[in-house]
Amino acid sequence: MNREKIFIIAGEDSGDLHGAKLIESLKKKNPSAEFFGIGGNRMQSAGLILIEHIKNLNVIGIFEVIKHYPRIKKIFNKTIKEIKKIRPHKVILIDYPGFNLRLAKELKALNFNITYFILPQVWAWKESRIKVLKDCCNKLISIIPFEKTWFAKKGLDVHYIGHPLSSLSNQTVSYTHLTLPTTPVV
C-alpha cells in the first residue's frame, strides 16, 4: 500500500504555527504519512518536506504584492508543478487566501482533493470568494465558532474544530493580572 501523501500550503507565520500543529496531529493518526508543501521552520520541524519557505511569500499590502508579483507567480507555478509530480492524496490550504484561493481553482481543475483550513474571512470582506470555496474545496474547516452557521446560510458545509491555540491558554486572564484599571480611565 502506498504511503499517504499530503501537500500543505501556508503562506505566513501564523499558518506555519497552525500547520505544524496540524502535521503533528495527522502524524498521530497516520505515522507513515508524508508531508510536502510550503511552510516555515515550524512545519519543517514537524515533518514537512519544504518545496518553498514562507519567507519567500511574505508580502503585506497591494503594493508589496505588485512589487514582488514575478517571484510570487514563479512560486505559484512551481507549487502546481510539484503537486502534479507528487500526486498527493489531499491538498490542505491554510489561510493565505490571495494565494490559496487561486491555487484551489487550478487544483480543482486537475481533480485534487482540497481541504481549506482556517477560512478566508469572507463575512468581513470579499464575500465573492464564497463561490471559489463552494466550487473548488472538498472540505472546509473553521476555527471561529460563528462561521459554521454563517457559511451554512450561504449553502456551505463547514466543520468547526475550535481554535488550535486555545489549548495554550487554559486560564482566564483578569484585568488585575494585567495590572489594568478596572474602572474607566477617561
Language-model region placement:
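Single conserved hydrophobic/aromatic residue that forms the stacking wall/gate
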Residues: 177-186
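Active-site and donor-binding regions of nucleotide-sugar-utilizing enzymes
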Residues: 4-174, 178
